[in-house]
Swiss-Prot record:
Alphabetically ordered keywords of this record: ATP-binding, Cytoplasm, Kinase, Nucleotide-binding, Pyrimidine biosynthesis, Transferase
SUPFAM superfamilies named in the record: Carbamate kinase-like
NCBIfam families in UniProt: pyrH_bact
Single GO term (MF): ATP binding
Protein name: Uridylate kinase
Annotated metabolic or biological route of this protein: Pyrimidine metabolism; CTP biosynthesis via de novo pathway; UDP from UMP (UMPK route): step 1/1
Organism, scientific name: Myxococcus xanthus (strain DK1622)
Gene: pyrH
Localization: Cytoplasm
Length: 250
């Protein structure tokens, strides 16, 4: 074997789940272009390394369906508005990636042909095989389901090997580390421990889907530049692995 033989990738196909708030930067609303471009550059690094990348982006930086419902809106209508917010974020990410020369496709669970392709599973897989980044918009297309659940569903449909759940902390903790100085980080967690302890990873529907299909989740800190690449390539102790055989402290 030659010395320049490439090391096999731990994950060939991944789904990156971003919250809408991840695009705000230090702002309180909307999209912060430098933050958006920084995330796009990390996605490009993965694609250039040969990783097939799909994304699901929330819409909470623009509108959150649950919040609208608590203010008296019809829940289904509020959720559909949230789905439209995810489409705005998906288009913004597509623009950022394509400005850097990376081919992308936005596939929407709600038909809007002028701005996105309709979601078809086989088409999504084909785009990935051709080296395009696929951005899944509009959640599952159904109210009452979160974008975390959409991420789990789409990851399974495209046969992704892992979900990367981007957050503002470096993994899953026993308590909120900003409020409790005794909080400890987990290196790995079983799905059942996440559900039993009601840990803030994803909603229970999303976790249950991953558990039933043995799909691992890596929860990591998006604010540290380079962590997306490090998590995918297995470089160092990055975040918390959900789906391990046992629960282990970091």
């Amino acid at each position: 074997m030659s010395s320049d033989t490439k090391k096999p990738l731990p994950y060939q196909r991944i789904l990156l789940k971003l919250s809408g708030e991840a695009l705000m930067g230090e702002g309180k609303y909307g999209i912060h272009p430098p933050t958006l471009m920084g995330i796009a550059e990390e996605v490009i690094e993965l694609a250039q390394a040969g990783v097939e990348v799909a994304l699901v982006i929330g819409g909470g930086n623009i509108f959150r369906g649950v919040a609208g419902a608590t203010e008296g809106m019809d829940r289904a209508s509020a959720d559909y508005m949230g789905m439209l917010a995810t489409c705005i974020n998906s288009m913004a990410m597509q623009d950022a990636l394509e400005k850097k020369g990376l081919h992308t496709r936005v596939l929407s669970a709600i038909k809007m042909e002028q701005i996105a392709e309709p979601y078809i599973r086989r088409r999504a897989v084909r785009h990935l095989e051709k080296g395009r980044v696929v951005i899944f918009a509009a959640g599952t297309g159904n109210p009452y389901f979160t974008t975390d659940t959409a991420a789990s569903l789409r990851a399974m449909e495209i046969n992704a090997q892992v979900i990367l759940k981007a957050t503002k902390v470096d993994g899953v903790y026993s308590a909120d580390p900003k409020k409790d100085p005794t909080a400890r980080r987990y290196r790995s967690l079983t799905y059942m421990d996440v559900l039993k302890q009601n840990l803030n990873v994803m909603d229970s529907t999303a976790i249950s889907l991953c558990m039933d299909n043995k799909l691992p989740i890596i929860v990591f800190d998006l604010t540290q530049r380079g962590n997306i690449r490090r998590a995918v390539l297995g470089e160092g102790d990055i975040g918390t692995l959900v789906g391990g055989s046992e629960t282990v402290w970091a």
